[in-house]
């Protein structure tokens, strides 16, 4: 293709503006990002070569070369990795090809980017860090296996870039940074050495650089010639140790080394919450270095979130997102697993079914959950910080991972009617403080704590002093389908089915009271049933309500209002179901309705009041009324009549 000029996507330009114009305190990260990208590119070509050796073109001298040129004022980062063709260059550099782009930009707005330059790498766009130190970037690349697929990309970060075909003898990518005048320190040998040592020492490929030294002149016999002066000699030196950190003994690794490796593989520059480093022996031999992050990634709940840890076989890279190694509810884990038992040519498809992978997964999950249980027991404050980030994801395991259900049910936490906002309790703690008269574990699901606190379904529980768990995560509706009991106590939703809260004596007294209410209000009760027969399954007097006039209750195994909302939000078909309308026989409204009914059973206002009762019950649970205009008209009329009295 001939040379053409194209515009960056809006989001890319916003990102470039952020990079170019923000005063970052640590500009060294640009080199870390580019070396990390080069390492990934070599990983990819090695993986592809397992099924197609021809793409290597005989070049297996894996390395990342740094070429500082003080005369030209440029620093080049060269790799012999997978390379890119024109289409891939435009997809990977001209655009941000991820559905999380908007979320990324929002995240930048929400954080103090002056103190968080590492955000760039966290979102997989580390290449743009080049513009922190360069006023022009030139990229020349050729896709492995296609000698005619070389292209040249160039930009000054001004909103556009040029791209054209070019010649390149070998596969891989050269990125040349034309350094700003005030950034020429990055051409200094010792500055480069210090950055590589600090950030990229563990990269498994040699990071090399030509180094020139003055050496004494030597004769043909190799002996130094006295008085012969010195000559310049240039040699290629390796700047990093390349020792895989996970193969080293824990006692040899500093906390700083663990943290730097975490940054390398995760692009998350906060410290990890926990580091799990161990070797497994027996039926399955492997080494694992697993990190539990401190904060959830912005795209954790997006479909294209990259999950899984890096898989190696005998230190040979296989894949960077092996989903088969961990269940979905642990998708936020980062790290490396290096197996001695898998074949080097294992395919991604085989990974899903391989018995060794399943053994590794079982081992990893057990180790991770044990670490979380230990943290919860020994440092509950730390665990709470973790749980506020990852609790909703961890809960998924209760529903899907039956083998580890017992461990997981000890890890999940909830707010409750007896905790302050932001404080949580475990099921174990809940059971320990249950009154002797309480036989079941009570909970209520909803969108938020504030909505649940005002629910009429809680009135009787407050009166009796029974604690109710607040379940405000959408996943909770699925959790309680699997977690039906705990420690011999059944979990019971306060807005479903019948409640058994009373002692035998209290029950007898309440039944007598309800029978009396039925006699007093049977006529109006039947009338309400008839008026609402198309909307509710039944109308009955309530044992839940002490202050409110009415509420809606689902059957024991029926859909409640919260579950219906969640299914609708997911564009799922919601099965048609009717709930029970419960009325409070002690509420003044029942007396008013009964009085009107006894005076004039044909009074047209009675039907309106029945509709208002139903609408009121919907509103108190946070559901919309079916006819808002009719509802507001009736309320306005009632207000006028009340004012006229």
UniProtKB/Swiss-Prot annotation:
Report the Pfam families cross-referenced here.
HATPase_c_3, HSP90
> Where is the protein localized?
Cytoplasm
What Gene Ontology molecular function terms does this protein carry?
ATP binding; ATP hydrolysis activity; ATP-dependent protein folding chaperone; unfolded protein binding
- State if Signal is listed as a keyword: no
Name the SUPFAM superfamilies for this protein.
ATPase domain of HSP90 chaperone/DNA topoisomerase II/histidine kinase, HSP90 C-terminal domain, Ribosomal protein S5 domain 2-like
Q: What is its main location?
A: cytoplasm
Q: Which cysteines are joined by disulfide bonds?
A: none
What keywords appear on the UniProt entry?
A: ATP-binding, Chaperone, Cytoplasm, Nucleotide-binding, Stress response
Q: Where is this region: B?
A: 349-565
Q: Where is this region: C?
A: 566-645
Region entry A: which residue ranges?
1-348
User: Could you state one GO cellular component term attached to this entry?
Assistant: cytoplasm
Report which superkingdom the organism of origin falls in: Bacteria
Q: Which family does it belong to?
A: Belongs to the heat shock protein 90 family.
HAMAP family tied to this protein: HSP90
Quaternary structure per UniProt? Homodimer.
Tell me the function of this protein: Molecular chaperone. Has ATPase activity.
In Swiss-Prot or TrEMBL terms, this protein is called Chaperone protein HtpG
Q: Which gene encodes it?
A: htpG
């Amino acid at each position: 293709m001939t040379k053409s000029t194209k515009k960056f996507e809006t989001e890319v330009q916003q990102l470039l503006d952020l990079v170019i114009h923000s005063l970052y305190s640590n500009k060294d990260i640009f080199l870390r990002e580019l070396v990390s990208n080069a390492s990934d590119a070599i990983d990819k070509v090695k993986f592809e070569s397992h099924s197609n050796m021809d793409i290597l073109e005989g070049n297996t001298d894996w390395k990342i070369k740094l070429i500082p040129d003080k005369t030209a004022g440029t620093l080049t980062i060269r790799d012999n990795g997978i390379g890119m063709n024109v289409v891939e260059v435009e997809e990977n550099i001209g655009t941000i090809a991820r559905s999380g782009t908007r979320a990324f930009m929002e995240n930048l707005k929400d954080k103090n980017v002056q103190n968080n330059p590492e955000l760039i790498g966290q979102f997989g766009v580390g290449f743009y860090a080049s513009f922190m130190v360069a006023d022009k970037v030139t990229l020349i690349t050729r896709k492995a296996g296609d000698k005619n697929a070389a292209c040249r990309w160039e930009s000054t970060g001004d909103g556009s870039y040029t791209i054209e075909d070019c010649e390149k003898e070998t596969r891989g990518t050269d990125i040349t940074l034309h350094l700003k005048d005030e950034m020429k320190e990055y051409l200094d040998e010792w500055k480069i050495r210090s950055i590589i040592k600090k950030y990229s020492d563990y990269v498994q490929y040699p990071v090399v650089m030509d180094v020139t030294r003055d050496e004494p002149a030597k004769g043909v016999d190799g002996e130094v010639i006295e008085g012969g002066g010195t000559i310049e000699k240039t040699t290629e030196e390796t700047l990093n140790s390349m020792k895989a950190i996970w193969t080293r003994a824990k006692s040899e690794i500093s906390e700083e080394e663990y943290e730097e490796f975490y940054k390398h593989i995760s692009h998350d520059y906060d410290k990890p919450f926990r580091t799990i480093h161990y070797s497994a022996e027996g039926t399955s031999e492997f080494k694992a270095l697993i990190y539990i992050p401190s904060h959830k990634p912005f795209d954790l709940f997006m479909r294209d979130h990259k999950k899984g840890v890096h898989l190696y076989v005998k230190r040979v890279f296989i894949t960077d997102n092996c989903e088969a190694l961990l269940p979905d509810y642990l998708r936020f884990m980062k790290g490396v697993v290096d197996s001695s038992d898998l074949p080097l040519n294992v395919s991604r498809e085989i990974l899903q079914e391989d018995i060794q992978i399943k053994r590794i997964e079982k081992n990893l999950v057990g180790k991770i959950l044990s670490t979380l249980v230990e943290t919860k027991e020994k440092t509950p404050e730390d665990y709470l910080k973790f749980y506020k980030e990852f609790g909703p994801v961890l809960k998924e395991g209760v529903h899907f991972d039956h083998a580890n259900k017992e461990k997981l049910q000890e890890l999940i936490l909830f707010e409750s009617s007896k905790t302050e906002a932001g404080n949580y309790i475990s099921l174990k703690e809940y059971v320990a403080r249950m009154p002797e008269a309480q036989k079941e574990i009570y909970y209520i699901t909803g969108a938020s704590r504030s909505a649940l606190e005002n629910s009429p379904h809680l009135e009787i529980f407050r009166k009796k002093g029974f604690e109710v768990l607040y379940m405000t995560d959408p996943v909770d509706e699925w959790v309680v389908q699997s977690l039906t009991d705990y420690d011999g106590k059944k979990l019971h939703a306060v807005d479903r089915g019948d409640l058994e809260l009373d002692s035998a004596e209290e029950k007898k007294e309440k039944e007598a009271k309800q029978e009396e209410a039925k006699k007093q209000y049977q006529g109006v009760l039947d009338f309400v049933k008839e008026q609402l027969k198309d909307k509710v399954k039944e109308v009955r007097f309530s044992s839940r309500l002490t202050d409110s006039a009415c509420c809606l209750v689902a059957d024991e195994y029926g859909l409640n209002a919260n579950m219906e909302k969640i299914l609708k939000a997911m564009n799922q078909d919601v099965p048609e179901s009717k709930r029970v309308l419960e009325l409070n026989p002690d509420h003044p409204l029942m007396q008013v309705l009964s009085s009107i009914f006894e005076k004039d059973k044909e009074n047209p206002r009675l039907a309106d009041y029945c509709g208002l009762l139903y609408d009121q019950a919907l509103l108190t649970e946070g559901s919309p009324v079916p006819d808002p205009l009719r509802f507001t008209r009736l309320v306005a009329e009632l207000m006028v009549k009340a004012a006229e009295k």
